[in-house]
Regions:
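Extracytoplasmic small-molecule ligand-binding "clamshell" domains
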Residues: 92-95, 197-266
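Bacterial lipoprotein signal-peptidase II cleavage site
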Residues: 24-44
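Ligand-binding clefts/hinges and TM-proximal coupling segments of bilobed small-molecule sensing domains
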Residues: 72-93, 134-135, 163-199
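Extended ligand-binding regions for polar small-molecule ligands
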Residues: 25, 40, 71, 122, ...
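Acidic, polar ligand-binding/catalytic clefts
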Residues: 49-60, 129-139, 150, 230, ...
């Protein structure tokens, strides 16, 4: 997927032309009924045509974009509302508690596009291949890290050491091969037989609606983050317990002590760094725009 800077794509092709609908009315009931039917059909066609016109980031001007509340997509799209030299000029942002809710709103023509992490976007498109696609240009690149309370620097340091080791020994690559590259026969990470947990249990806060990073399968939370967290905890001598919650509640849960760390495809941003510490990054992704075909 090609990636360009915000300024570069804002200097690219101009905005799409707007579609204008007009309808006539009649005093006869039969004509009124026919007119209403035609108007409804025309409105539906217009909505479809409007969405189909989104072929580039510039085409988002005047459109409504759906995001998951509190995510990087939410932060980025909120900055693009309105007019300005460095803005996309979108009409508004609709926030949803779950990414799937945003995609459903797109499928039912309630919004014009969805901004979400690229790997997550790929899974939604794969599940709806006849209806959805993504723009060829990624919106922004980002790096994921683990959120830890500023009051727990020892845990941050320990996790950083374990992250470095699991990158070096190929464990992280094995997990990514399973969930992203989808290498045939890739098994990801499985705790070695006889693994012990002398240091107790660490609680991880997540939002299990973010396939392939964390999602529920057969009643269990699985995915890149869940599996990598298990590998990290095994390395440090801790058992792992995962708590599922709204994404926007994760940082508060960690800071309050309800969870030891947060891991949910979480991007390191200056705003979040004011509230919480982050480990070294372990994965890089980009924001993608999902639209109707």
């Amino acid at each position: 997927m090609k990636k360009i800077s915000r300024r570069s794509f804002l200097l690219a092709a101009g905005m799409s032309a707007a579609l204008v609908l007009t309808a006539c009315s009649s005093t006869s009931s039969s004509t009124a009924s026919s007119t209403a039917s035609s108007a409804a059909s025309a409105a539906s066609d217009a909505a479809s045509a409007s969405t189909q016109a989104i072929q580039s980031l510039e085409d988002l001007a005047g459109k409504t974009v759906g995001v998951q509340l509190g995510t990087t997509g939410d932060l980025l799209m909120s900055e693009e509302v309105g007019e300005g030299e460095d803005k996309l000029g979108i009409a508004g942002v609709e926030q949803y508690n779950k990414a799937a809710d945003a995609v459903q709103a797109l499928l039912t023509n309630k919004i014009d596009a969805v901004c979400i992490d690229d790997q997550v976007a790929k899974n939604f498109v794969a599940a709806n291949p006849d209806e959805l696609t993504t723009l060829d240009t990624a919106f922004a690149e980002e790096s994921y890290a683990i959120a830890v309370s500023k009051d727990n620097p020892d845990l941050t340091e320990a996790l950083n050491g374990a992250i470095a080791e699991l990158k070096e020994d190929g464990t992280l690559d094995a997990i990514l091969d399973k969930y992203i590259a989808k290498v045939e026969g890739a098994t990801g990470y499985v705790s070695p037989e006889g693994t012990e947990y002398p240091n107790g249990t660490l609680v991880m806060a997540t939002n299990a609606t973010f396939d392939p990073y964390e999602y529920i399968e057969n009643g269990e939370i699985v995915g890149i983050d869940a599996e990598f967290a298990k590998a990290l905890c095994d390395k440090l001598g801790y058992d792992l317990h995962i708590e599922d919650m709204e994404f926007d509640s994760i940082i508060a849960a960690v800071n309050s002590g309800k969870a030891d760390f947060g891991m949910a495809g979480m991007t390191v941003t200056p705003e979040r760094q004011e509230q919480i510490d982050f480990t070294d990054t372990y994965c890089t992704a980009a924001q993608s725009i999902i639209v109707l075909k």
